[in-house]
C-alpha cells in the first residue's frame, strides 16, 4: 500500500512539473514581452529638454500620456524647419507643440485636439521710460530686443519688426534678466513662466524689472503624422485627463525646477 501511495505521489509530482514547464513555454514573462513589443512614438524636438523649460515640460507630458496608451516616447533633436519636413515625410511620428494653423502649411499631419501649452507672451524691461502695448510698438524704436529661443511665434514676428543687429535670442530667462539690469538689452520677451521666475528668484527681488505688455496668448498643439491618426483622439483624451488630475501642473513644476537649476 505504501509503495502504491509513493507511486501515485511520483506521478502527481511529475504531472505538476510537466504542466508547469508547458505553462512557462506557452506564457513567457509578460513584462519582457510587453517591453519588447511596445511601439515607440518619436517626436522631432528643435530644442534640447536639458536646456529648455518648454521642451522639458513637453517631454514629461508626452512620456506619461503615451505610456498610458501603451507606447514608449522618444525625441530626436533637429532644427525647426527640418522638424517640419521630417514630420511631413513621416520620418518622425510627431511634433510636441505648434500653433493651431500649423496643419494648414504642413501636409500629412493630424492635430491633437487638446492644447499642450496655454500661456501668454510677455514683454519685460527695466527701463521705466519704455512703454509698449503690442508688437507694432516695437517698430522703429531702436530697442535692443531679446526673446526666448524656441518660441517660434515670437521669432517670426520679431524678425519682421526688428533689425538683425538689434535682435538676439536667449536660452535662459535669468541671464536675460541680468542683461536687462545691466542695460545690455532693452526688452526681453518670453512666456509667463519667466514672470514666475522673476517673482520667485531672490536675485531679482526689489529690482526694477517689470512686465510691461501681454503681447498675445500662446497656445500650442501637438501634431502626429497621419499614419498615427488613430492615436490622435485617445491622446487628446489622455492629455485632458492629465490636466484634470493635476499632472500638467506637477510636470510644469518639475520642469521649472530642472530649468532653474540649469539656468543658475
From Swiss-Prot:
Domain of life from the UniProt record: Bacteria
Signal peptide: 1-23
UniProt-listed SUPFAM superfamilies: Periplasmic binding protein-like II
Keywords: Signal
CC annotations in GO: outer membrane-bounded periplasmic space
UniProt-recorded Gene Ontology molecular function terms: amino acid binding
Entries under Gene3D superfamilies matching the protein: Periplasmic binding protein-like II
Name the UniProt record assigns to this protein: Uncharacterized protein SO_0736
Lineage: Bacteria, Pseudomonadati, Pseudomonadota, Gammaproteobacteria, Alteromonadales
Amino acid at each position: 500500500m505504501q509503495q502504491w501511495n509513493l507511486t501515485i505521489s511520483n506521478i502527481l509530482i511529475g504531472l505538476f512539473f510537466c504542466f508547469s514547464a508547458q505553462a512557462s513555454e506557452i506564457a513567457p514573462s509578460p513584462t519582457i514581452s510587453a517591453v519588447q513589443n511596445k511601439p515607440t512614438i518619436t517626436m522631432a524636438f528643435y530644442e534640447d529638454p536639458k536646456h529648455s523649460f518648454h521642451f522639458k515640460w513637453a517631454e514629461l507630458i508626452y512620456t506619461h500620456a503615451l505610456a498610458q496608451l501603451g507606447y514608449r516616447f522618444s525625441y530626436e533633436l533637429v532644427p525647426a524647419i527640418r522638424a517640419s519636413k521630417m514630420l511631413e515625410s513621416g520620418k518622425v511620428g510627431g511634433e510636441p507643440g505648434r500653433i493651431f494653423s500649423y496643419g494648414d502649411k504642413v501636409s500629412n499631419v493630424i492635430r491633437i485636439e487638446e492644447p499642450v501649452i496655454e500661456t501668454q507672451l510677455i514683454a519685460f524691461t527695466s527701463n521705466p521710460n519704455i512703454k509698449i502695448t503690442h508688437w507694432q510698438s516695437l517698430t522703429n524704436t531702436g530697442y535692443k530686443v531679446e526673446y526666448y529661443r524656441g518660441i517660434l511665434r515670437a521669432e517670426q514676428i520679431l524678425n519682421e519688426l526688428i533689425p538683425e543687429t538689434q535682435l538676439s535670442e536667449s536660452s535662459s530667462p535669468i541671464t536675460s534678466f541680468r542683461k536687462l539690469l545691466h542695460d545690455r538689452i532693452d526688452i526681453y520677451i518670453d512666456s509667463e513662466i519667466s514672470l514666475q521666475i522673476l517673482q520667485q528668484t531672490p536675485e531679482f527681488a526689489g529690482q526694477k524689472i517689470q512686465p510691461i505688455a501681454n503681447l498675445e496668448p500662446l497656445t500650442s498643439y501637438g501634431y502626429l503624422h497621419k499614419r498615427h491618426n488613430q492615436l490622435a483622439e485617445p491622446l487628446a483624451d489622455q492629455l485632458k485627463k492629465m490636466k484634470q488630475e493635476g499632472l500638467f501642473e506637477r510636470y510644469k513644476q518639475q520642469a521649472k525646477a530642472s530649468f532653474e537649476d540649469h539656468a543658475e
